[in-house]
């Protein structure tokens, strides 16, 4: 027997594309500063990443041609294999998720056993994000849930774009779970 009435819920898989390569430096800098990283360290890393020159190295040798950024045409991103990329992405995505929650993108659930309310927004692992959607009323229609999912995904996509990121459409999907009383 069900203790609480079942509610329609949804989970959106909204995975990012090229997460380390698309990190914009200004929001990443602000996110790292919020974690206590000194601005001088951030400035050094960002300057190096923006102006670094790269070449291809294989078992056949090193490419004579280089590519990269300059002061006039800087690169973005944190660099694949960089020790700075994972903590930078962690800081950036935690700030983005905080903005998402403050804007109302979250599921509010009350435990029937503890009578405590939990605000859950997502489950994240690196660039793989599952957004949780929960309509406030147990009598909400499937259309209301679908509208909430669309609004939440659009909100998350807008926040991600502000950090330099993109949603990778091929890796995005939605699972709707609805109940019907008989």
Regions flagged by a language model, labelled:
Residues 45, 52, 56-60, 166-182:
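Short, conserved micro-motifs composed of acidic
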Residues 38, 95-102, 106, 135, ...:
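Short amphipathic alpha-helical interaction elements and helix-loop-helix interfaces
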Residues 1-3, 140-164:
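Inter-domain linker/hinge segments that demarcate the starts of reverse transcriptase
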Residues 1-35:
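Conserved catalytic palm subdomain of right-hand nucleotidyl-transferase polymerases, strongest
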Residues 9-19, 76-86, 109-141, 160, ...:
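Catalytic palm active-site di-aspartate
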Residues 1, 47-71:
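Reverse-transcriptase-like RNA-dependent polymerase core
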Residues 32, 40-41:
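Carboxylate/His-rich catalytic cores and anion/metal-binding grooves
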Residues 16-21, 26-29, 53, 70-111, ...:
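Conserved pre-motif C helix in the palm subdomain of viral-like polymerases
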């Amino acid at each position: 027997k069900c203790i609480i009435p079942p509610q329609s819920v949804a989970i959106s898989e909204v995975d990012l594309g090229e997460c380390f390569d698309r990190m914009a430096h200004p929001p990443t800098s602000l996110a790292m500063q919020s974690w206590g990283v000194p601005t001088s360290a951030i400035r050094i890393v960002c300057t190096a990443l923006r102006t670094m020159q790269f070449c291809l190295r294989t078992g056949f040798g090193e490419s004579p041609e280089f590519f990269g950024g300059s002061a006039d045409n800087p690169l973005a991103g944190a660099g694949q294999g960089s020790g700075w990329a994972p903590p930078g992405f962690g800081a950036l995505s935690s700030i983005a998720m905080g903005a998402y929650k403050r804007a109302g993108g979250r599921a509010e659930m009350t435990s029937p056993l503890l009578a405590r309310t939990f605000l859950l927004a997502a489950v994240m692992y690196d660039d793989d994000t599952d957004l949780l959607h929960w309509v406030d009323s147990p009598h909400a229609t499937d259309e209301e849930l679908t509208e909430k999912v669309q609004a939440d995904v659009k909100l998350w996509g807008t926040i991600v774009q502000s950090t330099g990121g993109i949603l990778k459409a091929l890796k995005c999907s939605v699972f709707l779970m609805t109940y019907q009383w008989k």
